[in-house]
Amino acid sequence: MNDTAPTQGVYLRFFVHENRRHGGMLLYDWLLAEAKKLGLSGGTAFRSIAGYGRHGVTHEAHFLELAGQETVRVDFVVTREAADKMLARVREENLPMFYAILPAEFGTLGGGK
């Protein structure tokens, strides 16, 4: 792999509850699968350790009674056009969820021998 010129794009983040489902799948898996279908080049799901949301409820992974209620963040570093396609897909399904879009510059570095 060789270096690529930096690309201007966005960091698209979705925040969902770990146990939330859509179409028979965990919602974070659904987001990753739909992004792949739309041609987004990659995505990653991260499980949170602790946090709180707009309702002020603290979620921590070590409380057994909150198992499955932790937040999963699903991230994509993509062009604005790709982010808009993904947001449109989520809107088509009428899925309520929080998201954030941040400006990003991205590319690839280096290569092997």
Regions found by a protein language model. Give the residues of each.
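Positively charged, small/polar-rich N-terminal and surface patches that mediate targeting and assembly
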Residues: 1-113
